[in-house]
């Protein structure tokens, strides 16, 4: 529960950042900022997010088995540092191609590094069952980021509006970086399966979570700067809702790491969890869509009225996407990252293909349509995996 609160605080902080940016610096800057944030989240899926999920599972197993996790920490830590440099370097030419100035490019690269380290450190702390620590530092760094944003706005430092978030994420990573579980290291600490699990997890999280970020990136690429800014107003209010499923997924991976049912939805508890979450989130998301015409113009006076239809359509797609994260997390907890990845590929390919085809023709609605259809395919695929009887001889994708 505390971990969910923590990620909710971070989501609210990110929302407030975009609201302030939109109000102070205008529609086009809002679009650029939101697109760069989506890019940072997307590239984090290419390793840091998967490394965090891997740390969450393997550190939890080592802790409960009273074994040292030094080898796992060392392996994942080095991989994180290398990937941070590579992903930041990849971000720079993309940000420049979108017409951003040096300050925004620097901020975008800094967010890529900071957010990636944040994802890894957060997953590791949840593996240690330290949800209170995670919630504390989520809150502290959110306040820090908002305070620094106020300074940037007062000083009219428009090119550097992303740096406050980058600093907040980096401070969290430093404070929560995994430093071991305290058990004495053995002469040989097995880390077999760690990178293999993480590699399949990359494919799993990209194909299941990547479409959401590609929706905003598609708007930035296929629409005018003004239309992308209007869509960003809807996107920034829709994405915090998806964090419910992401937060629950991060909690489920370590909590269910020792279950022997392979993430099956045939068990009563797992089925009730998925159905209950789907029903509860439908109520929440439905209220957001229903009240959009009232609160959007208040939050974004310049863009709100024009973004109402975009938000309502997005909420349908985000709900389908969010529900699919829960059965996927149960499968990941059982070590079935390979199956989740392969099951999600079809949805990602269909969704991304529709974005590419419909984006230039239908504008921002084309991106949302691709996201909705791709998420629906993913949901059907992971539910099918969870319901299907698993062979007794099947083994997890990694060895503890």
Regions found by a protein language model. Name each.
Residues 114-136, 316-343:
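Membrane-interface junctions at transmembrane-helix termini in multi-pass inner-membrane proteins
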Residues 45-64, 234-262, 332-333:
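Helix-loop junctions and terminal segments of transmembrane helices
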Residues 1-49, 199-225, 348, 352, ...:
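Signature of the first transmembrane helix
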Residues 132-137, 158-210, 261-265, 390-400:
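Interhelical loop/hinge segments that connect adjacent transmembrane helices in multipass membrane
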Residues 105-109, 114, 135-183, 348-350, ...:
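Hydrophobic alpha-helical transmembrane segments
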Residues 34, 64-81, 195, 263-279, ...:
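Interfacial transmembrane-helix starts/ends
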Residues 37-45, 231-250, 284, 314-321:
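Transmembrane helix-bundle signature of multi-pass secondary active exporters and lipid flippases
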Residues 27, 94-108, 290-322:
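Interfacial segments at transmembrane-helix termini and the short loops linking adjacent helices
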């Amino acid at each position: 529960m505390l971990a969910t609160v923590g990620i909710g605080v971070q989501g609210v902080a990110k929302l407030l950042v975009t609201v302030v940016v939109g109000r102070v610096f205008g529609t086009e800057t809002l679009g650029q900022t939101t697109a760069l944030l989506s890019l940072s989240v997307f590239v984090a899926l290419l390793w840091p997010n998967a490394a965090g999920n891997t740390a969450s599972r393997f550190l939890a197993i080592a802790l409960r088995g009273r074994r040292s996790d030094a080898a796992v920490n060392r392996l994942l830590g080095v991989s994180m540092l290398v990937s941070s440099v590579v992903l930041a370097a990849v971000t720079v030419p993309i940000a420049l191609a979108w017409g951003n100035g040096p300050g925004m490019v620097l901020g975008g690269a800094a967010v890529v590094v900071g957010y990636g380290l944040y994802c890894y450190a957060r997953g590791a702390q949840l593996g240690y069952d330290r949800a209170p620590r995670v919630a504390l530092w989520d809150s502290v760094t959110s306040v820090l980021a908002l305070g620094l944003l106020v300074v940037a706005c007062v000083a009219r430092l428009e090119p550097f509006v992303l740096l406050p978030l980058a600093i907040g994420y980096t401070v969290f990573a430093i404070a929560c970086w995994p430093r071991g579980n305290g058990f004495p290291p053995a002469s040989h600490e097995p880390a077999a399966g760690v990178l293999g699990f993480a590699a399949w997890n990359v494919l799993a999280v990209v194909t299941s979570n990547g479409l959401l970020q590609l929706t905003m990136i598609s708007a930035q690429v296929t629409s005018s700067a003004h239309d992308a800014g209007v869509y960003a107003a809807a996107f920034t209010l829709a994405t915090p809702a998806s964090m419910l499923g992401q937060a629950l997924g991060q909690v489920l991976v370590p909590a269910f790491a020792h279950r022997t049912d392979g993430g099956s939805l045939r068990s009563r508890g797992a089925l009730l969890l998925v159905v209950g979450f789907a029903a509860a989130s439908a109520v929440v998301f439905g209220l957001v869509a229903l009240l959009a015409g009232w609160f959007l113009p208040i939050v974004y006076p310049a863009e709100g009225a024009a973004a109402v239809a975009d938000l309502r359509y997005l909420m349908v797609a985000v709900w389908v996407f969010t529900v699919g994260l829960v059965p996927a997390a149960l499968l990941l907890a059982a070590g079935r990252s390979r199956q989740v990845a392969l099951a999600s590929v079809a949805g990602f390919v269909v969704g991304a293909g529709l974005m590419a085809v419909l984006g230039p023709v239908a504008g921002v609605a084309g991106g949302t349509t691709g996201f909705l259809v791709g998420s629906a395919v993913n949901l059907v695929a992971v539910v099918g995996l969870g319901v299907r009887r698993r062979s007794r001889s099947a083994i997890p994708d990694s060895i503890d």
